[in-house]
Regions:
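A general marker of short, structured functional hotspots
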Residues: 1, 35, 67, 110-111, ...
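Conserved residues at beta->alpha junctions
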Residues: 3-4, 99
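CN hydrolase (nitrilase-like) catalytic-core segments centered on the catalytic cysteine
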Residues: 4-94
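Cysteine/selenocysteine-centered motifs that mediate thiol-based redox chemistry or coordinate metal-sulfur cofactors
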Residues: 14-18, 104-129
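A short, polar/charged loop-to-alpha-helix boundary motif
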Residues: 92-110
Length: 129
């Protein structure tokens, strides 16, 4: 599970994969604005880089005590970064149900050897304060 704002940081997505994740859910309450553009590119990137499925969930509606307009558009992507079915509605609550072939995880990880080819010796600066 990766929650809302965390999705902007690839290090955590990688840690989930290295710890055996095959499916990562990312619940969010994200309103329109700059991050709407990122909504459809970050999670497929996490799926590809880590060879797992991603379920990206965002709420819809407007907060009564503010002007936040939440844009929904929940979706699932496979380990190749491809959308599974249609993206959810931008205005109506709905339940998305998707079939996933879990054997795709191993196929993708064996084809794209991103874990094998990574260079942790180069990452010291990523974890320095």
């Amino acid at each position: 599970m990766y929650i809302c704002y965390d999705r902007h940081f690839p290090e955590g997505a990688r840690a989930l994969g290295l710890n055996g994740a095959e499916m990562v859910f990312i619940p969010s309450a994200t309103s329109r604005g700059l991050s709407e553009y990122l909504w459809r590119i970050e999670q497929p990137s996490h799926a590809v880089a880590n060879g797992y499925f991603v379920g990206t969930i965002n709420r819809v509606g407007i907060e009564p005590l503010g002007d936040d307009d939440f844009y929904g558009q929940s979706y699932f992507v496979d380990p190749r970064g491809q959308f599974i079915g249609d993206v959810g509605d931008a205005h109506q609550e709905e339940l998305l149900v998707r079939d996933m072939d879990l054997s795709m995880i191993e196929q993708v990880r064996q084809t794209w050897q991103f874990y094998r080819d990574r260079r942790p010796d180069m990452y010291d600066d990523l974890v320095a304060p």
